[in-house]
Every structure is written in structure tokens, then in C-alpha cells.
Design a protein with these regions (language model features):
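Alpha-helical transmembrane signal-anchor/signal-peptide segments
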Residues: 43-58
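N-terminal intrinsically disordered, low-complexity, charge/repeat-rich segments that act as generic
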Residues: 2-4, 29-34, 46
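Soluble "head" domains of membrane/secretory-pathway proteins
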Residues: 2-21, 54, 58-231
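Hydrophobic membrane-insertion alpha-helices, especially the h-region
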Residues: 24-40
Length: 231
């Protein structure tokens, strides 16, 4: 019976093993680099609520840059949960991997509270040291060191839209308020709002947020395609 040279060629087998090993190393390296890039340099998030409509679509996908953690007025940020649980290293690693493939929609470990246990996307409207008050769902801001109030739109770095619609009279005092008294933010405290001022849960409910809760800034909405935009 005639034998193939591959059956007895030691050098051929070694070369074949090296090719396979190099291919495996290449695939693993690409996967790790991609995972690190999409988790620590630029990662995708899925918007599963209408709290930021109309500018940020429900069921949309946007990219967040975690290096941009010092926002200006009017910019959109990605916030950590209010009651985020401190996890051991192995659980955090599992969360990181699964969360990457789930577009930041699901983590197997940690809080599952629908209001305070999830990440959220909100717009920064007032900075540390600013004074503010709200009237008819529009925030008026007096920047730190200045003497006059301006609307949130006049101070924003880019124009944006908010959603306000009529609610029944019986709703007065329920849900998110459309009026707030004059208040001054403390050091390292930001005031954030949902663009949907009727449905969104934001600083009107939980107050100003610390910078440690800001995990990055939204820079690009990629889906739906007809609403693709840079922030």
C-alpha cells in the first residue's frame, strides 16, 4: 500500500502544527484586541427605552467613548447604576465578556432593579457650581461665577430637542416634576435630565450625580441608519 509523505514526515507534521498554532494565536489575539477596544476605547450600547427620544431612538445603538468623562453642558453621557453592586473579579470578568456580546444590555451578576440597577443614558444640563431652577420642564442655569440665568438650550454646546406633552391634571405631583426650586450644585456634582421630560427618571428624582457615575460620553448613534448622527 502506498503511503503519503505526510504519514512519516516529522518535519511536515511540525510545520503543520506551527501553522495551526499560529492561526489559533492570531484568532485569539484579534478577539482579545477587539474585546479590549470595544470595552475600554469605544463600546456599543443599546437604548431600550424612550427616555431620550427624539434625538436618541428607542431600540437604537450608539457608541460610547469611556475616555470622555468630563462632559460639557448639553452632552450625553452613559451612567452607571445608582445601586451598583461591588463584585468579585471573576464575576466582573464574566459580566464584561457577556455584556460585550449583548451590547451592554445584560449582565448575569449584579443588581436587577429596573430603575436603579441598570445603566442609563442622560444629558448633562448643569455643571458643578452651577445654580438652576426648572419651569415648564425647561431648566434655567446660572453658570458658576456668573450673574444671570439662561435656558439649557442657550448654554448647550450643540442644539438638541426635548419631548414634552400634556398630562392629565390628576397627574400633578406625580412622576417627574416640571418645576424645581432654585438650587446650587456642589463640587463634583452634575445635573442630568432625560430628553423625554415626562417619562424619564433623572436628577429630578435622584438629585445631582457624582463624576464617578459617568462611564463615558455618547459620540455616535449608528442605528437606526436613518437617524445616524454624531453627538
Amino acid at each position: 500500500m502506498k503511503q503519503n509523505v505526510a504519514d512519516y514526515s516529522f518535519e511536515y507534521k511540525k510545520k503543520k502544527q506551527r501553522v495551526i498554532q499560529h492561526a489559533v494565536v492570531l484568532v485569539v489575539s484579534v478577539f482579545l484586541c477587539l474585546t479590549l477596544f470595544l470595552n475600554f476605547i469605544l463600546f456599543a450600547v443599546y437604548t431600550n427605552s424612550s427616555s431620550m427620544e427624539t434625538d436618541i431612538s428607542k431600540d437604537g445603538v450608539s457608541f460610547v467613548c469611556p475616555f470622555l468623562k468630563k462632559p460639557s453642558r448639553g452632552q450625553v453621557v452613559y451612567l452607571s447604576p445608582l445601586d451598583e453592586e461591588k463584585l468579585p473579579v471573576y464575576k466582573s470578568a464574566v459580566n464584561l465578556i457577556i455584556n460585550f456580546f449583548a451590547l451592554q444590555k445584560y449582565k448575569p451578576f449584579g443588581s436587577t432593579n429596573s430603575m436603579t440597577g441598570k445603566h442609563s443614558i442622560r444629558r448633562v444640563v448643569a455643571l458643578p457650581g452651577d445654580s438652576y431652577y426648572m419651569k415648564d420642564y425647561v431648566l434655567y442655569v446660572k453658570p458658576a461665577g456668573q450673574n444671570f440665568y439662561l435656558t439649557e438650550f442657550e448654554l448647550a454646546t450643540k442644539p438638541y430637542n426635548i419631548r414634552i406633552y400634556s398630562v392629565p391634571v390628576e397627574w400633578d405631583g406625580m412622576g417627574c416634576a416640571g418645576t424645581l426650586p432654585e438650587t446650587t450644585l456642589a463640587y463634583d456634582e452634575y445635573f442630568v435630565l432625560a430628553d423625554n421630560r415626562i417619562e424619564g427618571i433623572d436628577s429630578r428624582v435622584y438629585g445631582g450625580i457624582k463624576s464617578e457615575r459617568i462611564e463615558g460620553r455618547l459620540i455616535w448613534q449608528v442605528f437606526p441608519f436613518n437617524k445616524m448622527k454624531l453627538f
